[in-house]
Amino acid sequence: MSAVSRRNVLRGGLVATTAGVVAPGTVAEAVAAADGASCPAPPGPAMVGHGDRRYRSLASRGYNRRVVGEPEHVWVVGTTAHVVRAAQQAVDSGGRITVRSGGHGFENFVADPAVEVVVDMSAMTGVSYDPARRAFAVEAGALLGDVYRRLYLGWGVTIPAGWCADVGVGGHILGGGYGPLSRLMGLSVDHLYAVEVVVVDRRGRARAVVATREPSDPHRDLWWAHTGGGPGTFGIVTRYWFRTPADGDDPSGLLPAPPAGVLSFQVSWDWEKLDRTSFARLVRNHGAWAEQHSAPDSPYLALYSELALTRRPSGTVFMIGQVAADSGAERMLDEHIAALNRGVPVQPVRPVRNQAWLAAALAGSPGDPGPVYRLKVKSGYLRRRFTDRQIEALHHHLTRTDYDHPGGGVSLYTHGGKVNTVAPDATATPHREASIKMF
Ligand SMILES: Cc1cc2nc3c(=O)[nH]c(=O)nc-3n(C[C@H](O)[C@H](O)[C@H](O)COP(=O)(O)OP(=O)(O)OC[C@H]3O[C@@H](n4cnc5c(N)ncnc54)[C@H](O)[C@@H]3O)c2cc1C
C-alpha cells in the first residue's frame, strides 16, 4: 500500500474503499445508544482549533518529530457517536481528515501539512469484557500498557502485542501487532475477533460498522482488512474485540495467559573489539540461530531478542530481549548467547533481570514523553539469514568514516514460532514464513 493511498484515509479513499467492502444498505450500524445514557459523561466531542489552549498538546503529540503537521482542528472524542460526527463534519466540509491514537506512527500519515482535521482517540481507553460477544473490548485510544495491565489484572490474560507500552492499540493492531510473546502466541491480529469502525459510504454518510471474523458475517472482509491491512486505510477504528478462536464461557480461557515472570536481558559487544571477521561471524550466527528456531516446535519459542547492529560511533552492538518462561530461562539465554558468540573473540557484557511479567510489559512508563526522536524507519521480513555479501555491505555502512553520525543501524528481531502456524491468507498479514523481522 503506497503512502499516497494510505494518506487518502478518510477523504475520497475511505469512501471508495468502504463502498467496495461494505454494501450500503446491508450493513449493521453499530448503534451508539449505549454511549453514555446511565454512565458518567465521556470527554468530548470538542473541536479544538488554533485559539484553544489544548491545541498544542493535541496537535504535536506524535513520537516522530521528523514529521510535523498543523491541522485546522483536532477533535477530542469520547464515544463512537462522537467519531461519526467528526467524520461527517469533515466529509461535509471537504476537509482532509485522519486519526491519531497512540501517536507512535513512524510516517507522516497524521502529522503532515496536508492534513486538516485530526480525530484524537486518546480519551477512548476502555478495556472490558463483553459477555455478549464473549470477547475483550478494547477502545482504540488505549495504550498497550493500559491493555496489558487491565487484561492481566482483571482476567490473567493478554494479547501478544508490542514491547513499547506507549504504543497505541489503534494503529498497532492494524499493522499486525508483533511483540515479545508472539513466537509463543502469534500476532495480536491472530486473536482479533471483531472491530468497530467508522466508515463513509458512497453517499457520503458516516456511520459505525461492526465487522467480525464469523464466517457468516457479511462484513467479514472488513474484519479481514483490519488484520494487517495497514492503519488508517479503511476507516477509523473505535473498538477492537479480542478472543482467541476458542470455546468456553470463562473469560480467563479466551485469550492466552502470559508467564508469571520473565528474564529480561541486555547483551552488548564493544565495537572497538569487533573486527570485520568477528562482526560477520556474529551476524551469521544470529541468522543461523533464527532460521533454526523459527519453526513452531522450537524449544526456544519463549526467547525473544532484538539484535541492534548500530553504527560504530555509538560504541556497542547490543541485543535486548526477554525469555518468557517460568523455568529454564537462564539456560535458554546462556545457550542463545553461546550460539551467537561461537567463534567471536569478544566476550559480551550481559546484565539480566528477573521480573514479574507485568513489570516487564509496562517498562517504558506510559505517559512519559521521553526524548524527542526524529526518525526514518523501514522494515522487512527475512526468510533466510543475510548472505556474506549482504553482511559485508552492512559492515561497510555501519563503520564508514565519511559519515560520523552515531545514529542509524539495522535491528534484527527474532520471528516465527506460532506466528508461522497461520495460513498467509487467513489474515491480512501474509508474512508467515519469516525467521527475522528487520527494522
Ligand atoms: C517506540 C516504538 C516502538 C514500537 N514497537 C513496536 C512493536 O514492538 N511491535 C510492533 O508491531 N510495532 C511496534 N511499533 C510500531 C507501531 O505499532 C506502529 O507505528 C503503530 O501504527 C502505532 O500506532 P499508534 O496508534 O501509536 O500511532 P498513531 O501515530 O496514532 O497512528 C499510526 C497510524 O495508524 C493510524 N491510526 C491510528 N489510530 C487509528 C484508528 N483508531 N483507526 C484507524 N487508523 C488509526 C493513523 O492514522 C496512522 O496512520 C513501534 C513504534 C514505536 C515508535
Give residue ranges: language-model regions.
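N-terminal secretory signal peptides and thylakoid transit peptides that target proteins
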Residues: 1-17
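C-terminal region of N-terminal signal peptides and the immediate post-cleavage residues
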Residues: 19-37
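Loop/turn elements at helix/coil->beta-strand transitions in domains of secreted/extracellular proteins
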Residues: 92-96, 114-115, 154-158, 233, ...
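Glycine-rich N-terminal segment of FAD-binding domains in flavoprotein oxidoreductases
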Residues: 52, 63-124
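Glycine-/small-residue-rich beta-strand-loop submotif within the FAD-binding core of flavoenzymes
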Residues: 65, 110-139, 180, 184-185, ...
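FAD-binding subdomain of flavoenzyme oxidoreductases
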Residues: 161, 166-270
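Short, structural beta-strand-to-alpha-helix junction motif
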Residues: 134-138, 142-152, 168-169, 353-357
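Cofactor-binding catalytic cores of oxidoreductases
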Residues: 36-63, 102, 107-110, 252-439
